[in-house]
Amino acid sequence: MSFTVIIPARYSSTRLPHKPLLDIAGKPMIQHVWEKAQQSGATRVIVATDHPEIEQVVTRFGGEVCLTSDKHNSGTERLAEVIEKMAIADDEIIVNIQGDEPLIPPLIVAQVAENLDKHQVNMATLAVKLTTREELFNPNVVKTLTDKNGMALYFSRATIPFGRDYFPQCDDAFVQQQNYLRHIGIYAYRAGFVKQYVAWEPTALEQLESLEQLRALWYGEKIHLDLAKEAPQVGVDTAEDLERVRQILNILCSQ
């Protein structure tokens, strides 16, 4: 099976300016993400960026990079530009990894590509089981649920499904006994579908929830969803996240 990883890497970030270039254990963050993608068995790994400085850094460490517009509203739009510029075949599997996930397990990068390859759908993603009450009611944790065939029914920042007879008194033990799922933001697409996806008008649901994947469900597409074989560790959204990741990678790199 052939698949291509595309890593969108935006230069601007409100909370962490120049985030992809921040140093972690002696390397820029984007290099750690690129190395994890390389370890997944991908046929090709492309960094998609809107800034020449990131382009130069990726070129220096030997990565393939595509300079894209800085006008995109989402990472998926950036993917579509790369697919068009690089003339990637419509049937190629594309895995989208965020550029702020330096601890992404290579195992699940390969897993989401394999899941798409095995199912007659245009999009696949992963989830892990929720284990705490705090996560269950946290709007920053995206919840999801599937039908009997492993197809996503919905994604929400709200608590789904809602246990009418158990909330809000439930505890961690209750959550662990149920099948509540936390969505992981890693996707596999068929390249031709990405071009269709960005051509669709944004929907009220995706705008209300601030969840772009709801566009696919709104337009009638199936999204395959499976439990990740390995739970990813923290991504880098804040300065606190950055320090945690630095501590983890400093330890790993010193072993």
Swiss-Prot record:
Q: What is its EC number?
A: 2.7.7.38
* The keyword Cytoplasm is assigned to this record: yes
Gene Ontology biological process = CMP-keto-3-deoxy-D-manno-octulosonic acid biosynthetic process; lipopolysaccharide biosynthetic process
Record-level GO cellular component terms: cytosol
Q: Which InterPro entries match?
A: Cytidylyl_trans, KdsB, Nucleotide-diphossugar_trans
Query: Which reaction is this enzyme known to catalyze?
Result: 3-deoxy-alpha-D-manno-oct-2-ulosonate + CTP = CMP-3-deoxy-beta-D-manno-octulosonate + diphosphate
Q: Which pathway does UniProt place it in?
A: Nucleotide-sugar biosynthesis; CMP-3-deoxy-D-manno-octulosonate biosynthesis; CMP-3-deoxy-D-manno-octulosonate from 3-deoxy-D-manno-octulosonate and CTP: step 1/1; Bacterial outer membrane biogenesis; lipopolysaccharide biosynthesis
Keyword Signal assigned: no
Which keywords does this chain's UniProt record carry?
A: Cytoplasm, Lipopolysaccharide biosynthesis, Nucleotidyltransferase, Transferase
Family recorded in the similarity comment: Belongs to the KdsB family.
What is the protein's name according to its record?
3-deoxy-manno-octulosonate cytidylyltransferase
Q: Which organism is it from?
A: Glaesserella parasuis serovar 5 (strain SH0165) (Haemophilus parasuis)
Q: What is the lineage of its organism?
A: Bacteria, Pseudomonadati, Pseudomonadota, Gammaproteobacteria, Pasteurellales
